[in-house]
């Protein structure tokens, strides 16, 4: 079974086809992991926003259904064990236009990928160059880089 971690842009890039592609991936024995921080951003925050556009609400509900049906597995990194990785990721992802306190879901992804890669091969699906570079550097230093593959969203799902 392959373990595939999805970031927010990996979900967004597929648009309305996302549920169909998730079903197809799971049928080929893939385990699709959605970080809880990504779910917060794409589902919870949207459904809690009264002024969210209807198409955003529909997309959020579709993602929630995939979670409820077991097609997407929610995971958090072990915050205590990987707090240094989370802090480093937040610093690396932040820049002049995005202060550290505004870095949201992506800061947890390198820690989750590193944790999962301790026991199995992991594919991170993202088009975000900064996140890719951060994961590449951190997993190399954590001695799990050989267990991690970085893939473009349109090539995996």
Indicate where each model-derived feature is located.
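Active-site-proximal, substrate-binding regions of enzyme catalytic domains
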Residues: 2-116, 131-133, 137
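Acidic, PIN/NYN-like endoribonuclease modules and their adjacent C-terminal/linker elements
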Residues: 118-157
């Amino acid at each position: 079974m392959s373990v595939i971690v999805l970031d927010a842009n990996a979900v967004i890039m597929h648009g309305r086809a996302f549920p169909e592609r998730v079903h197809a991936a799971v049928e080929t024995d893939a385990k699709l992991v959605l970080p809880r921080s990504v779910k917060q951003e794409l589902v919870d925050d949207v459904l809690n926003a009264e002024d969210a556009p209807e198409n955003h609400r529909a997309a959020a509900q579709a993602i929630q259904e995939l979670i409820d049906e077991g097609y997407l597995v929610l995971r958090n990194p072990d915050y205590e064990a990987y707090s240094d990785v989370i802090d480093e990721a937040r610093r690396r992802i932040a820049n002049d236009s995005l202060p550290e306190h505004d870095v949201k879901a992506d800061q947890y992804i390198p820690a989750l990928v590193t944790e999962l890669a301790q026991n199995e091969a992991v594919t991170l699906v993202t088009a975000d160059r900064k996140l890719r570079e951060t994961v590449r550097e951190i997993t190399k230093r954590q001695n799990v880089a050989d267990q991690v593959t970085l893939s473009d969203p349109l090539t995996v799902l």
